[in-house]
């Protein structure tokens, strides 16, 4: 019986992870944490009966304690509670399904506690990859990617020598606005941006997919996960979301991982790695598929990819600025405070204004995040 902990259990990745647990009889959920969706969290606790549960707000924790008073479960709150869940003693693997930089500290502490990490939280490696990867190696911990693209690359390089990789080809669907030109994006709405053609995801990542910032974040994440240079990573558009990513080797051979757009596959692969398990889901019908389309992204219109390359080449604290500015801008867009194209303007403005911190510590990273939020707030409150 494998014991797991999940932070972000009520979100898209968290709920699909629990679907995997439901379908298999050999995983026990020892610890759960969520934001403030207490109603769903209560349902999860009643079904999976973890030993410890975390919720962000102490008020929500009190509410949960009353609702679950018949259970002998420890209920914790805040960042310390999140860390306690992430490091729970009996859990062997932590699924980081939480969105945002809030996931960094729990991940660091879980690595120190010897937990393998099923990583779905992009921000952890984007902002702190230079800390996370050496720490994981020193602690003998595996970082197992859950993102479909990074899982695809991870599967393609299994059994290969890392120094034989020529380049990684990360695929993008193109998002809700594939084929749009800049003038067509001037008046798109939140509702338009949230209509992803292939994937069912959370609101923030769906907007990131529409801006292609998501691919930019994945470029930075891939650099750390697979120890490659930015010039060895290329983004291509694969609008059917059938090819999840590819690896070209030094002899010109290319391996690709194909499958239907279903996040359960990479989640399950991370949970059972290196074993493969049967998964009940749709399979590809090559006879009906027709042509597989591969195209180049319009990086002039969708600037998110180029911002990411600039951030990773600059290094230091710049990836944190890129990430934090995007987080804040997407939040503002979802609240209908700004237009879609202003997301790019905010990211660029912050990156241009920032004074680089070389080799930032965790404290530097969080202070940089705070600087970004304050800079944006001052700009819009002038």
Model-identified regions with their sequence ranges:
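Catalytic, metal-anchored helix/loop core of enzyme active sites in primary metabolism
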Residues: 1-382
């Amino acid at each position: 019986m494998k014991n797991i902990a999940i932070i972000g259990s009520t979100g898209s990745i968290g709920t699909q992870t629990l679907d995997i647990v439901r379908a298999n009889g050999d995983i026990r959920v020892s610890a759960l944490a969520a934001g403030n969706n207490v109603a769903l969290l209560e349902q999860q606790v009643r079904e999976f009966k973890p030993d410890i549960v975390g919720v962000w707000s102490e008020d929500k924790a009190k509410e949960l304690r009353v609702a679950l008073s018949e259970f002998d479960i420890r209920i914790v709150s805040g960042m310390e509670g999140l860390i306690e869940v992430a490091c729970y003693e009996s859990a062997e693997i932590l699924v980081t399904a939480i969105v945002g930089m809030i996931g960094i500290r729990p991940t660091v502490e879980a690595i120190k506690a010897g937990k393998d990490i099923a990583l779905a939280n992009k921000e952890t490696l984007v902002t702190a990859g230079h800390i996370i990867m050496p720490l994981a190696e020193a602690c003998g911990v595996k970082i197992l990617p859950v993102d479909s693209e990074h899982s695809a690359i991870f599967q393609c390089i299994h059994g290969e020598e890392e120094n034989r990789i020529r380049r990684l080809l990360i695929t993008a669907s193109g998002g809700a606005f594939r084929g749009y030109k800049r003038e067509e994006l001037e008046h798109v709405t939140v509702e338009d941006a949230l209509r992803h053609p292939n994937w069912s995801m959370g609101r923030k990542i769906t907007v990131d997919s529409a801006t292609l910032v998501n691919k930019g974040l994945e470029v930075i994440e891939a650099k750390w996960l697979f120890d490659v240079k930015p010039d060895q990573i290329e983004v291509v558009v694969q609008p059917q979301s059938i090819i999840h990513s590819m690896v070209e080797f030094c002899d010109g051979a290319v391996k690709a991982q194909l499958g239907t757009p279903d996040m359960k596959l990479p989640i399950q692969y991370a949970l059972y790695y290196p074993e493969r398990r049967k998964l009940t889901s749709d399979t590809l019908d090559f006879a009906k598929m027709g042509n597989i389309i591969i195209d180049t992204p319009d990086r002039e219109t969708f600037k998110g990819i180029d911002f990411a390359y600039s951030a990773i080449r600059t290094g230091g604290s710049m990836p944190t600025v890129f990430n934090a500015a995007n987080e804040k801008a997407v939040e503002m867009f979802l609240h209908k405070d700004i237009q879609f194209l202003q997301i790019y303007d905010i990211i660029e403005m912050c990156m241009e204004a920032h004074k680089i911190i070389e080799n930032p510590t965790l404290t530097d990273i969080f202070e940089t995040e705070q600087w970004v939020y304050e800079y944006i707030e001052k700009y819009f409150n002038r």
